[in-house]
Amino acid sequence: MFQQSSSLEHKKIIDDKTYLIGSAGKMLIVDSILIALDYSAQPILHLFDIKNNIYINGMGEKGQGPNEFLHPTSLIHSSTNSFLIYDLLDNTLKKIWLDSLMAGNVFYEKIMNFNSISNSFVFPTAYDNYIAFGLYESNMFKLIDQHNNDIGYFADFPVKSKEEKKIDHRNIALAYQGTLNISPDKKKIVYVSYYGTIIGIYDIQSSVINQKFLLVCDYPMYTVQNEGSGMSSPITKEGISAFRDVYVTDKYIYSLYSGNKISELRERAFEAKDIYVFDWEGNPVVHYHLDVPINNIAALPNDKKIYAISNLPDPTLIEFEIDL
């Protein structure tokens, strides 16, 4: 599928003794600042100056107090001086200004507190509404207006068979969980699956979401285990650990892929050393094979460098030079 392939070697750019990351999460580049989420430790935000190659600071605390976070899961570009965080556990989209972070202060504005606890990801669109992805009774996406009302539900997971369609849709959504990112113009969104091997690109309009591209190489292998009011769709040991992260620029989609069998490598199955780059039409551009496994990715807007965090053995910020 990918006619162009290249091997990349990493470079450490910042002294790893100047920072300590617990469990590296999503990353975002705003101007010359790289922001990285930390899922397991405090501070929850790490700031790197990738122009001068220095660690700026770590900040942000978990909690329910003013300007604290419960469980932030995504970073979303907002402007040259701000970004958004979706906090999963309090269903809130929060806006943060870089100026305040650079001054050592964490201050956010709550943009919207959503009604549903079923949203895994929420992004603002170009049409003054929001696109959400989550564990719904039908479909995989929904649009929400500025007044917190549902506009409608759209698209669905590409299940393997008619029999699978008879399963409770929330179980399907649990098995087909993945990660997403929205284009800089906020008019397109990409979904990649954590298990199986699925990538989908969708056009966003003011009142509808249309599937533009879909690639299915493998389906998630799972069982349904519902007891009482609880729901579960555990992945079997024969399942494939697929995409670990996805990052986007104006031109390209960078998908970080593992492809390992969980039964063979266990925890190491979630290590990823391959980046598959697509354009926004779904055309394959290039396959990068990395010299070290990484946890997440970010790319410069000009598509000249990829940044990642790799366990070397401690979580360390590294870069790869590319030429797209």
Spans of features found by a protein language model:
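A short helix->beta-strand "capping" segment at the edge of beta-propeller domains
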Residues: 1-22, 283
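Blade/loop signatures of beta-propeller domains
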Residues: 1-10, 219-224, 264
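Surface-exposed loop and turn segments in beta-propeller and other repeat-based domains
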Residues: 11-18, 57-68, 107-117, 151-173, ...
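Beta-strand-rich domains and repeat architectures in extracellular enzymes and scaffolds
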Residues: 13-43, 247, 251-261
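Structural signature of eukaryotic scaffold interfaces centered on beta-propeller domains
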Residues: 23-28, 73-78, 120-127, 170-185, ...
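Asp-box/WD-like beta-propeller blade repeats and closely related beta-sheet repeat scaffolds
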Residues: 90-91, 97-134
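Conserved blade-ending motifs and adjacent loop-strand segments that build the rim/top face
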Residues: 218-228, 280-301
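Loop/turn-rich, solvent-exposed surfaces of beta-rich toroidal or solenoidal domains
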Residues: 236-277
